[in-house]
Curated annotation (Swiss-Prot):
A motif ('KMSKS' region) lies at residues 239-243. It comes from Methylobacterium sp. (strain 4-46). ATP binds at K242. This is Glutamate--tRNA ligase 1. It comes from the Bacteria. One of its GO terms (biological process) is glutamyl-tRNA aminoacylation. GO terms for cellular component: cytosol.
Amino acid sequence: MSSVVTRFAPSPTGFLHIGGGRTALFNWLYARKHGGRMLLRIEDTDRERSTEAAIEAILDGLSWLGLDWDGDVIYQFARAARHREVAEGLLAAGRAYRCYASPEELTEMREAARREGRPLRYDGRWRDRNPSEAPPGVRPVIRLRAPVEGETVVEDEVQGRVVWQNKDLDDLVLLRSDGTPTYMLAVVVDDHDMGVTHVIRGDDHLTNAARQTQIYHALGWTVPSMSHIPLIHGPDGAKLSKRHGALGVDAYRGLGYLPAALRNYLVRLGWSHGDQEVFSTEEMVAAFDLKQIGRSPARFDFAKLENLNGQYIRATSDADLVAAIEAILPSQGPARGLPARFDDALRARFLAAMPGLKERAKTLIELLDSAYYLYAPRPLALDERAEGLLGNGGRERLAGVLPRLEALPDWSAASTEQAVRDFAEAAAVKLGHVAQPLRAALTGRATSPGLFDVMAVLGREESLGRLRDQARAA
């Protein structure tokens, strides 16, 4: 299927939603699997709500996720003349008609339907009337002359065969009274003109599929293959919302998630491939199949994403993690007293410490916070637990072990560990009773990477300086 063309078509009214990110991923994977193309169309016809900032956020979010699109970005609003041309063609062919119903008539129509418990549908009153009967001063809309008998059927790759009775579908508006095209018309025309072969989108568009299928049939165009994927719900089964947590791809970026980890997590929301949970990009492309997408809503498990991100952090090279940390410094550094860029010395220190740092961190933010000891100014600010470890004789034990450390001819993880063990044995105390005050004095925290690795990374002068600061406070 080398001619496969998919598209991701977001509306630029806000950030790139996590659900939109998954939709883009599924379109990207399907296109890449079949050697096809994924196009990007910005559906910016709602001029009041569409913003340049939102467009930038969408493009940036897709790029960060590693989802490259093919060709130039297409802007729907710029194609309005083409949409009008198609509507006028349907009108000329008798497949559409001008409707002169006034806003007051339409309001009364809806209210009558509510009173009588009927669906809110346009009643077709101008379907067969002569335009010469049009009331003065009413600018018409153009409506599709939809079939009133039979069925409209969508053979959906995910949902299966979906059938609508045509009597339940009214004559939808194609062109508004001001000449602007509706979403339904614009999507069909754009997908056709762009050569889209496969429409993969959220199942909240399933009813739209029936409407759009009718437009395709009226135009005599081939209906693309359709796949309506289940929406993402929160852990409680309710539709994902702000109360569940972060919603935008940019928020997860800011929280310190790796794009590869988020991509991996998103692909497993609604799609499965046996029991496999962790996929490289190449494995995703090779395995992806629309038939393996379920119909039930996928539940977003924040803890599972966090654990998966931790796996990715541990599997990422130390140099790449340092680069990832540097990428978030402009937003995360100032609050921690860090510059927007590492100097060579601090970069080298981070690189040396990374094997220990990444063992416990589940996000880049956690990793940066656990690296506090690398960049903390002296004297270190101690958290409450660290302060507790230095009480009850902790500082005295620091003062006792200092001479042994100061006398070391060679400073390394192995030599410092041996010196501390020798002191603990000579003082007849448990190793932990010496190691924990040392950890607190060196890192300002009660937990850290391996203590002696910390000492090796900090080096002799910085380590001894921090220990003397706290020993003197005894």
